Amino acid sequence: MTFAAPLEAKSIRFRARSFVAFTLTPEAPMVEWLQGLDHWIGNSPGYFAGRPVLLDLNVLKPAPSEIAALVAELGTRGIRIYAIELEGASLGPDLPPLLVGAKEATTEGLLPGRKGGQEGSGKPDGKAAEGRAPDHGTEGRADAGAAGKGKAGASKTDESGPQVSHYDSGTLMIKTPIRSGQAIMHAHGDVIVLGSVASGSEIVAAGSIHVYGTLRGRASAGALGNTAARIFCRRNEAELLSVDGWYITAEEMEGVSRGKPVQAFLDGDGLRVETLS
């Protein structure tokens, strides 16, 4: 006598998520671009550690062999490429997959792209390639991400994260200090920190960033293309300040705005850091 167990219908669950992606867009000449990248990494060690990065090659349009060499170069710098954007390309199995159908997002919704400017300290100066931070965009895919679609959220690097409050306006309020190693990524509006931000931590916000204590970590406002975003802090000891991807480092602020209450904002085609009275 045989016994047949009843079949159980099992469903496969698919969910769409939106998340903040970090995008690198290489430009020729590659030697100079890599030197600029090394300068960025030197000023912000560990910035790419553990983060998937999108490689946008629509400007460079390299051959597959050149892509492999570039991915290897980035790998030696601790940058892990999880997907490549290159219209009309066909890549082999030894390269990261092509990202198809994703759109860049801003606080106003999905857009095909956005514009950028140049950075500076006080006055706009320097080449764009030397002052451009990695782009931050939201890419829609059917897998896990840092911020879920719908309710405003923040991602942290450990379980014992800061106390946060969410508001319908999209503002994220953090009531406790942000410790070293923690990362707050808020793709729905402003971030307000009532305490201090430790060295080695990071805040990424679609809107403005307000720190009512000492800012010692990295702060990136306007991460989804909001050029009107600003960064405010009571005491500036930041490792890096960035608005809409244009940044200024600690060494560039030394002797000018370090240790003072400041605001950082885009002024024309440059990033300006001003002291507050």
UniProtKB/Swiss-Prot annotation:
The gene is minC. Cell division inhibitor that blocks the formation of polar Z ring septums. Rapidly oscillates between the poles of the cell to destabilize FtsZ filaments that have formed before they mature into polar Z rings. Prevents FtsZ polymerization. This is Probable septum site-determining protein MinC. HAMAP family: MinC. Residues 122-142 have a biased composition (Basic and acidic residues). Interacts with MinD and FtsZ. Gene3D superfamilies: 2.160.20.70, 3.30.70.260. It holds the Pfam family MinC_C. It comes from Mesorhizobium japonicum (strain LMG 29417 / CECT 9101 / MAFF 303099). Signal peptide: none annotated. PANTHER family: SEPTUM SITE-DETERMINING PROTEIN MINC (PTHR34108:SF1). The lineage of its organism: Bacteria, Pseudomonadati, Pseudomonadota, Alphaproteobacteria, Hyphomicrobiales. Belongs to the MinC family. Keywords: Cell cycle, Cell division, Septation. GO terms for biological process: cell morphogenesis; division septum assembly; regulation of cell septum assembly. Residues 107-168 are annotated as: Disordered. InterPro entries: CAP/MinC_C, MinC, MinC_C_sf, Septum_form_inhib_MinC_C.
